[in-house]
């Protein structure tokens, strides 16, 4: 079964495509150099990986196994794989088939032929994922009036996040304000200390756990200065949240 590439309008793909092998290898090497996470989709599931090596002379690249042995076995016999990576300000997509399992630095890994086509899409917007209701992910910091806040993260991307709060923050923030050293508690997914730049706020209607509609404030922020390590780790979190969401949807569909 062929896994189709997503997220790029068919009419626009040609302006993003790379067909030159040297250019494709350069992009793969850049993903390796920056330790960028890859989301690997196939007909039986998905897993998170990283490129370990690029070997143009053998027309191969090597990538890491996923964390679950069952998923690795499924991927090995799935046929075509669809790879998606999201380095800063861009999106990389390509298809490949696993050639075989190999040993790399003493550990098992997958190898595949270097793709004939690769899409490098420069983006102005980032993929945004809604966070789970439980456990709640939170941000803690200090507002310009020196009061401490603890707000719930509603959604998250490499570009920024949105926070929900019942607290009236009207007039406390103006567009462009930067809140320094905000503590992002992402539960099992880790802890980050970041700066947030205020974009805007709005009143929105949400449904609480009792099924009742409530009004709450939505505060939007962007990340003005993520370093490479923070960006890499945050991308890993976003991939993991997406994987968990997809698994949950699949379970509901099977009921």
From Swiss-Prot:
It holds the Pfam family PilZN. GO terms for molecular function: cyclic-di-GMP binding. GO terms for biological process: bacterial-type flagellum-dependent cell motility; regulation of bacterial-type flagellum-dependent cell motility by regulation of motor speed. It is found in: Bacterial flagellum basal body. Its main location: other. Residues 122-240 form the PilZ domain. One of its GO terms (cellular component) is bacterial-type flagellum basal body. Keywords: Bacterial flagellum, c-di-GMP, Nucleotide-binding. The keyword Ribonucleoprotein does not apply. Monomer. Interacts with the flagellar basal bodies. Acts as a flagellar brake, regulating swimming and swarming in a bis-(3'-5') cyclic diguanylic acid (c-di-GMP)-dependent manner. Binds 1 c-di-GMP dimer per subunit. Increasing levels of c-di-GMP lead to decreased motility. Belongs to the YcgR family. HAMAP family: YcgR. This is Flagellar brake protein YcgR.
């Amino acid at each position: 079964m062929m896994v189709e590439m997503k997220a790029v309008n068919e009419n626009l793909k040609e302006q993003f495509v790379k067909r030159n092998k040297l250019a494709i290898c350069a992009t793969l090497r850049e993903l390796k150099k920056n330790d960028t996470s890859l989301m690997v989709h196939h007909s039986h599931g998905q897993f998170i990986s990283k490129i370990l090596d690029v070997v143009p002379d053998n027309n191969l690249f090597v990538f890491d196994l996923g964390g679950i042995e069952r998923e690795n076995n499924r991927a090995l016999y799935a046929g075509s794989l669809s790879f998606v990576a999201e380095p800063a300000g861009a999106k990389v997509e390509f298809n490949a088939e696993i050639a075989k399992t190999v040993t790399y630095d003493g550990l098992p890994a997958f190898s595949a032929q270097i793709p004939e086509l690769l899409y490098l899409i420069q983006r102005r917007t980032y993929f945004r994922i809604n966070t789970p209701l439980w456990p709640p992910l939170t941000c803690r910091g200090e507002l310009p009036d020196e009061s401490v806040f603890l707000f719930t993260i509603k959604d998250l991307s490499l570009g920024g996040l949105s926070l929900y709060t019942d607290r009236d923050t009207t007039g406390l923030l103006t567009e462009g304000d930067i809140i320094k050293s905000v503590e992002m508690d992402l539960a099992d997914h880790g802890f980050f200390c970041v700066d947030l730049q205020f974009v805007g706020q709005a009143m929105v209607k949400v449904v609480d756990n009792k099924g009742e509609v409530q009004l709450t404030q939505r505060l939007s922020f962007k990340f003005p200065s993520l370093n490479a390590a923070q960006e890499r780790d945050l991308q890993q979190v976003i991939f993991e949240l997406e994987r968990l969401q997809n698994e949950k949807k699949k379970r509901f569909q099977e009921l």
